[in-house]
């Protein structure tokens, strides 16, 4: 079975494309998923992309727990839970799955309360301010990370 990447999106990301487009852009979550599936294929690596979005902290935690032993890497945009959720941090630490934290906007150019992340110091990498392209960068990073550790055999060189 090919290695899998779990894409997790937190609160309000179901509104992507319509919620504050000047900050988050006009790409919908559905369109983004299509792009990311194509990105996985373009890497010439046999990867499976799984996705889950919830506005509920407990549902995200349950999905992280279910990933243990079943997922090789997580790409997460925790949304507002970035700044508030010790529980999400503990769930990610508890399953010991490497992850990248993604933010569409540059959180450091926004309100002060958005500058603090409960996840960043546990992440393999943090990507912010690249718009939805940040997700593509995270998927590429995850593929390379898995390849370097022998988790995935390349069909062709990256």
Curated annotation (Swiss-Prot):
CDD domains for this protein: DHQase_II
Keyword terms of this UniProt record: Lyase, Quinate metabolism
InterPro entries: DHquinase_II, DHquinase_II_CS, DHquinase_II_sf
A GO MF label: 3-dehydroquinate dehydratase activity
Recorded catalytic activity of this chain's protein: 3-dehydroquinate = 3-dehydroshikimate + H2O
List of residues binding substrate: 77, 83, 90, 104-105, 114
Enzyme class, broadest EC rank: lyase
Pfam families, alphabetized: DHquinase_II
Enzyme Commission numbers on file: 4.2.1.10
Site feature Transition state stabilizer, where: 19
Function comment: Is involved in the catabolism of quinate. Allows the utilization of quinate as carbon source via the beta-ketoadipate pathway.
UniProt record similarity statement: Belongs to the type-II 3-dehydroquinase family.
NCBIfam families per record: aroQ (TIGR01088), PRK05395.1-1 (NF003804), PRK05395.1-2 (NF003805), PRK05395.1-3 (NF003806), PRK05395.1-4 (NF003807)
Protein name: Catabolic 3-dehydroquinase
Species of the source: Pyrenophora tritici-repentis (strain Pt-1C-BFP) (Wheat tan spot fungus)
Gene name for this UniProt entry: qutE
């Amino acid at each position: 079975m090919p290695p899998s990447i779990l894409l997790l999106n937190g609160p309000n990301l179901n509104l992507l494309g319509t919620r504050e487009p000047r900050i988050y852009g006009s790409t919908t979550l559905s369109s983004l998923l299509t792009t990311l599936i194509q990105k996985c294929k373009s890497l010439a690596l046999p990867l499976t992309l799984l996705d889950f979005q919830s506005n509920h902290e407990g549902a995200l935690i349950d999905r992280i727990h279910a990933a243990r032993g079943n997922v090789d890497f997580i790409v997460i945009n925790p949304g507002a839970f970035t700044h508030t959720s010790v529980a999400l941090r503990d769930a990610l630490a508890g399953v010991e799955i490497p992850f990248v934290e993604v933010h569409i906007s540059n959180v450091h150019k926004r309100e002060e309360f958005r500058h603090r992340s409960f996840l960043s110091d546990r992440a393999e990498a943090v990507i912010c301010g690249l718009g939805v392209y940040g997700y593509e960068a995270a998927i590429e990073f995850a593929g390379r990370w898995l390849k370097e550790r022998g988790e995935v055999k390349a069909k062709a060189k990256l």
